[in-house]
């Protein structure tokens, strides 16, 4: 069985993944807080987690993967100084928190489907596991890690000897950049203590509350992932995945409370793809004007062109997004589809069987290549090597199909280009391309976008290439 390596945040080095049970892998993913649409920066992380899971499957592993849905309790600060994200969404749209949660959960998985991100077999809303949260908190009380103060229940981080081991930083390092106007929660024994259960909070209008041994209230954010993972994936987790901004405090706190409860190491490998940035910095919903899959579609981009864009870069590198770089990726993706369509046509014409030995050799190389720290860009390079090789069309096609079980670019759905529009229609569209180029030069982005939409309505997409803008039949 192939060995797959990833950068392990816990050890700060690339390591081969050795599951607790040979041939079987457990993986937990921090799911979305469903108060708004996921932006494409969020989705980059889920794309890379999806690739990792599918690579293990191609390599012969049985993968059991779980994900939470945060539909309660996600405050932007454990000091109760931030915003309750679900309450924020409910106020913004004049709906209940559960209406918001249902809508944006469906929207999240709709975006995932467009990007060929496989839905985990285990998906658990936080609100469905309140008894499990309470049970875990009770266990922390029994073991001396929890205390009640001011009505709330807190985790005592001073009881954890290696609390900062995931971050590799000290308490002082992690306090750098904290705003001066953030008031400490006076109920805490230690600055890094965090809430396990709220009964008193500044959010008096919080509509989601439950009975508990400590009073009527709701769970803190961190408890949910520990309780859900322990329930569905057991006490020995192989890989925990999430965005890099979850390392501290969320994942640090998950480790503290999980290991305090079970009394041994909980998770061996921590997988944190880096941020997608735009020119102004990290993408964030709090900035407003978020860039979603739907926005990309409105501008004429295929969602899988964005997936291809992400696969071109290593997951441990911050990726800078611009429409220019996405245009280049979209152009390369369309050319790739065209080449695969030609191979499909040639294979159908020849009617021969693939050379399974050659296919297996290339699949082994693909697993070894991508499995060296999830190097998807080298995986794409190997794909192009197959396209240019002397293999028969049938062998190429069978190899591409196996590669695409991981890349998930719908390569096997590639079809020959449709017939072109009449000359007079193309002439009008070419004129629009000239006008769009002038608008872009003048930085008149509104006009450029309007022209792109007009071209799309005519059944074409604009693909920007080094030689200039080209028309592509949708």
Where are these regions (language model features)?
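Short, glycine/charge-rich beta-strand/loop segments that flank catalytic centers
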Residues: 66-73, 101-108, 118-133, 151-160
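Structural preference for alpha-helix termini/caps and helix-kink/transition segments
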Residues: 282-284, 289-474
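The substrate-binding groove and active-site-proximal loops of carbohydrate-active enzymes
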Residues: 88-96, 121-127, 215
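N-terminal, positively charged nucleic-acid-binding surface of large information/translation enzymes
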Residues: 11, 20-116, 464-471
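Short, well-structured beta-strand/strand-turn elements
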Residues: 62-64, 144-150, 390, 461-463
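Alpha-helical recognition segments enriched in aromatics with Gly/Pro capping
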Residues: 1-35, 50, 109-110, 130-344
């Amino acid at each position: 069985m192939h060995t797959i390596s990833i950068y392990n945040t816990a050890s700060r080095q690339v390591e081969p993944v050795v599951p607790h049970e040979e041939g079987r892998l457990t993986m937990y993913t921090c799911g979305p807080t469903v108060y708004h649409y996921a932006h494409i920066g969020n989705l980059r992380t889920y794309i890379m987690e999806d690739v990792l899971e599918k690579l293990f499957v191609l390599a012969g592993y049985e993968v059991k993967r779980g994900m939470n849905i945060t539909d309660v309790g996600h405050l932007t600060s454990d000091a109760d100084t931030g915003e309750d994200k679900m309450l924020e969404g409910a106020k913004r749209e004049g709906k209940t928190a559960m209406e918001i949660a249902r809508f944006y959960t469906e929207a999240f998985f709709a975006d995932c489907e467009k990007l060929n991100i496989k839905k985990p077999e285990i998906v658990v809303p936080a609100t469905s596991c309140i008894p499990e949260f309470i049970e875990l908190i009770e266990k922390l009380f029994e073991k001396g890690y929890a205390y009640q103060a001011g009505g709330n229940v807190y985790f005592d981080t001073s009881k954890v000897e290696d609390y900062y081991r995931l971050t590799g930083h000290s308490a002082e390092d992690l306090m750098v950049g904290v705003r001066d106007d953030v008031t400490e929660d006076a109920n805490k024994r230690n600055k890094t203590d965090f809430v396990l259960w709220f009964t008193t909070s500044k959010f008096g209008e919080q509509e989601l509350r439950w009975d508990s041994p400590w009073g009527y209230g709701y769970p803190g954010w961190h408890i949910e992932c520990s309780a859900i993972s322990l329930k569905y994936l057991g006490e020995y987790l192989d890989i925990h995945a999430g965005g890099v901004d979850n390392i501290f405090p969320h994942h640090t706190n998950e480790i503290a409370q999980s290991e305090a409860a079970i009394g041994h190491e909980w998770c061996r490998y921590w997988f944190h793809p880096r941020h997608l940035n735009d020119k102004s910095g990290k993408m964030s919903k709090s900035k407003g004007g978020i860039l979603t899959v739907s926005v990309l579609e409105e501008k004429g981009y295929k969602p899988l062109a964005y997936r291809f864009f992400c696969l071109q870069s290593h997951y441990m590198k911050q990726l800078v997004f611009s429409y220019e770089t996405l245009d280049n990726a979209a152009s390369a993706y369309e050319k790739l589809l065209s080449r695969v369509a030609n191979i499909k046509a040639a294979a159908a014409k020849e009617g021969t069987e693939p050379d399974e030995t050659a296919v297996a050799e290339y699949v082994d190389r693909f697993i070894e290549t991508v499995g060296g720290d999830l190097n998807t860009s080298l995986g794409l390079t190997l794909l192009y090597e197959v396209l240019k090789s002397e293999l028969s069309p049938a062998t190429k096609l069978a190899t591409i199909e196996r590669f695409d079980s991981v890349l998930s670019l719908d390569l096997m759905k590639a079809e020959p280009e449709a017939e072109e529009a009449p000359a007079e229609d193309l002439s009008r569209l070419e004129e629009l391309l000239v006008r769009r180029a002038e608008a872009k030069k003048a930085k008149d982005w509104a006009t450029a976008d309007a022209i792109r939409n007009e071209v799309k309505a005519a059944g074409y997409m604009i693909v920007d290439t080094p030689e200039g803008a080209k028309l592509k039949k949708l």
